[in-house]
A protein has these predicted regions:
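Conserved SAM/AdoMet-binding glycine-rich loop
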Residues: 1-59
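Radical SAM enzyme [4Fe-4S]-AdoMet core and its adjacent flexible, acidic
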Residues: 24, 40, 44-45, 49, ...
Length: 154
């Protein structure tokens, strides 16, 4: 809802300043506009952490939910984040259209060497509020998801 921060040309400068004054810096990104060189520059500027949003483990459904093709780029970016030495969180907004892939999402986060998987729910405002029936999980989906999460807890 706040826009893609990697579109900013001065992002490294902002990260550097924030780091110098003692702030924790966390880049929340779609992961599609960034490359290894930029990640290295952000790391050198003092970036502490990166969070990448992945809509689903199924590329077609992921791109349908996101509204653009970029699933493979997101996966590649996660690998680059780890390669440059930054901690990674995978952010997965789970809902009726992708909750059936929750176990796969957990497995993907492990495969990507993510420190964390943030399982979030849809923020019901604006378009999502008007179309909430397309997102609200069924009781059966929630019950299954609860079991999956409990089994995966470390």
């Amino acid at each position: 809802s706040g826009g893609e921060p990697t579109a900013r040309k001065d992002l490294e400068e902002l990260v550097n300043h924030a780091s110098k004054i003692g702030l924790y810096t966390n880049l929340i990104t779609s992961g599609v506009l960034i490359n290894e060189n930029r990640l290295k520059k952000l790391y050198d500027a003092g970036l502490d952490h990166v969070q990448v949003s992945i809509q689903d483990t199924d590329p077609n459904n992921s791109e349908k939910i996101a509204g653009f093709k970029g699933h493979q780029k997101k996966i590649e970016t996660c690998g680059l984040i780890r390669k440059v030495g930054l901690p990674l969180t995978v952010n997965a907004v789970m809902h009726r259209q992708n909750l059936h892939n929750l176990k796969n999402m957990i497995e993907l986060a492990v495969e990507l060497d993510a420190e964390r998987l943030e399982v979030a729910q849809v923020q019901y405002y604006g378009w999502a509020l008007k179309n909430q029936t397309a997102f609200l999980p069924t009781r059966e989906q929630l019950d299954k998801a609860t079991i999956i999460v409990e089994e995966a807890r470390i």
